[in-house]
Amino acid sequence: MNDIQKSDFSSKSDNCGISKTGAEHDGFGWDLHCHSSFSDGTCSPAELVEKAAQIGLSGVAITDHDTTAGWQQAAAAAQKLNFPLIRGTEITSHFGRVSVHILAWLYDPQNEAICALFDNLTKMRKERILLMTDKISKDYPIDREAVFACMKSGDETTPGRPHIADALVAAGVCENRSQAFAGIISPKSPYYVPASSPDAVQVIKAVKNACGAVGIAHSGAICSRGPVLSEEQIEELADAGLDALEIFHRDNPEEQRIRLKKIAGRLNLLATAGSDWHGKGKINRMGENASDSETVREIVKRSFLTVAGM
């Protein structure tokens, strides 16, 4: 995965908002949190990179859930456009009763512990989605095949609730993903199956063992994602090797950003920014929150993989 392979990707105009011609990027920041069709995004990795270049980002990170499957396509597109790419993953975990999504950047993807971790997470994800789909299918016109059909990258797609949501939309049950998440597949729904995940300390140590940098995604999303980590819990994760907190994210209210800035300052953690872009899968706009080059250089310094121009 270290070597970028050439691709025959050709740009096109589609629902990812990409035009047929390229655009010079003037470098207004780095979006360190974006998803492709290899998890729950709607655009291919190549389209993700091309859009980042066209809107003027300095660079972009591909951070699909629990997989590196989209890295090669993204890297090929980045090389073709001479555009800086950060290869990463958003890893599902928990710490106590808090759901913790860990942004892992620029680690060795061939590390045995990382590979085993992703294999286990994929297995747990598939089991959960099948259980939820079977429960929903008793009352609504969707089945496993309909959900699988919504996984745009086939067997390499990391399965998740968004794919059930897409199947419900395709069946005319829901108008969009947001409606599905607010109702049929919400945690309060009788069809909901809780996610299984590894402990956050275990995940952080695995990424650090693979020589990557580690951040906590949407670390102050108290309104939309349930309980958030306390200062004491963040300190424990910092002791395990945590490098950063994603402070600038649309789900973090201002009071949480203020709290997290103070914690990051005390613990000497990096403050990162990301859009959590999913193409048409969310309203989030790529680049709406962007990290500066100094922060990215520090991430690269701590990591196994390199980034062009850094």
PLM feature segments, named:
Residues M1-V98, I185-S186, P198, Q202-K282, ...:
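An N-terminally biased module of ancient metal coordination in phosphate/nucleic-acid-related enzymes
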Residues D14, T21, A77-E235, A290, ...:
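Extended substrate/RNA-proximal surfaces in nucleic-acid metabolism proteins
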Residues N268-T272, G279-F304:
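C-terminal active-site subregion of NodB/CE4 polysaccharide deacetylases
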